[in-house]
């Protein structure tokens, strides 16, 4: 069962008087949440060399997302979506990446691959050291810890290729073709942290 369907399953069963038994795994339950130490988070923000601090709504968005291992964040144009993504990614790398896994960021266009890379550099990241970009026939094998790719470039990759990722961030997730995105997510079985970003939600 896809995690996103869990809430609908609970509603379906509740309306029909069915009980639901769950067995928690290392990934937790889709609707479970954990407490984020805001003192630790504030110290983290001070130490990562940001050119500016997050606005209140950006701060709240990151904290809310971190309380869950998967979520869709509604982030309209001008809200600083790439900055929210950056903070989530860097917090994961600093505190949650216990298995030394990589981060995969999926975008719909090559221009967004370059834009995110440029944004992350502006936020203080050493992009030459840490980021590998995949599109238009670029090499899909790298030792770098963060991969930014178009979904078109990777959705046909074998399952083994996705096992190195512990976090997946999807930009403009409402525009992904459902079968392609499902293929990626189903193959990335080791990715405990999954977040989608969109400026609009359909339905």
Could you describe each region identified by the protein language model?
Residues 28-74:
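Conserved pre-motif I regulatory segment
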Residues 121-159:
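Inter-Walker segment of RecA-like/P-loop motor cores
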Residues 1-33:
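Interdomain "pre-motor" coupling segment immediately N-terminal to P-loop NTPase/helicase cores
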Residues 74-75, 106:
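Residues at the beta-strand->loop junction immediately N-terminal to the Walker
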Residues 82-87, 91-92, 99-122, 203:
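Conserved Walker A/P-loop ATP-binding site and its immediately adjacent core
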Residues 79:
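ATP-binding Walker
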Residues 151-203:
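SF2 helicase catalytic motif II
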Residues 2, 54, 105, 147:
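Conserved SAM-binding loop
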